[in-house]
Design a protein with these regions (language model features):
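Structured soluble/peripheral alpha/beta segments that form catalytic or ligand/cofactor-binding pockets
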Residues: 1-190
Length: 190
């Protein structure tokens, strides 16, 4: 696909390289959320071109009115991609810790974490009896925020995005450095 922002002189071309689906517990019709943790991107800004890895999440459904979440998507060039969330939809808890591992083989392997949780500067999960710690710097090198509203619905949520340096540790051993997008949002969804 292509995204064009002519007023900013930006064009992004992307290709979906990995896609996974699963349901969110609070969605009344059990519609699956689509996760695309590996978008292969080319970003053109005037006379400059940059390669990038992107993420897309697509969901539609009948959700409770209130929600809140912390989400992180991190890319480690020599190891893989981690995406993780700790969320509440209404009174339903929803969290996950996923690793798209590219370090062991040429074939990508999706590993699902258990016992996952988030803190202000970290996300944690257990995968195959190993403890994964995704740590990110307290200082963002780029950030953006906005109030999300839709009419005629009553959605009003504050969305914040922050880009930060990240470190991946497995069983207290550092295995990689990368970049992460930390996203958090709280308010109403309907």
């Amino acid at each position: 696909g292509t995204i064009c922002l002519p007023e900013a002189n930006i064009e992004i071309q992307f290709q979906v390289a990995a896609e996974f689906t699963w349901a969110v517990p609070a969605e009344k019709n059990h519609r699956a959320v689509i996760h695309q943790p590996k978008l292969l991107c080319t970003v053109n800004t005037g006379d400059r071109t940059q390669k990038a890895i992107g993420y897309c999440k697509i969901y539609d459904g009948d959700y409770p009115k209130f929600w809140g979440y912390h989400f992180v998507h991190a890319f480690f060039p020599d190891y893989g991609i981690i995406w993780s969330a700790e969320a509440t939809f209404g009174e339903e808890k929803y969290n996950y810790f996923k690793l798209l591992n590219t370090s062991q083989t040429e074939k990508e392997i999706l590993l699902n974490g258990e016992d996952s949780y988030h803190r202000k500067t970290s996300a944690h999960g257990r995968i195959q009896d190993k403890i994964y710690h995704l740590k990110f710097d307290n200082n963002a090198f780029a950030n953006w925020s906005s109030i999300l509203r839709n009419q005629p619905s009553t959605m009003e949520s504050k969305l914040c995005l922050e880009y930060r340096p990240a470190i991946l540790e497995i069983d207290d051993q550092k295995v990689g450095e990368g970049i992460c997008l930390k996203e958090f949002c709280f308010g109403t969804i309907t």
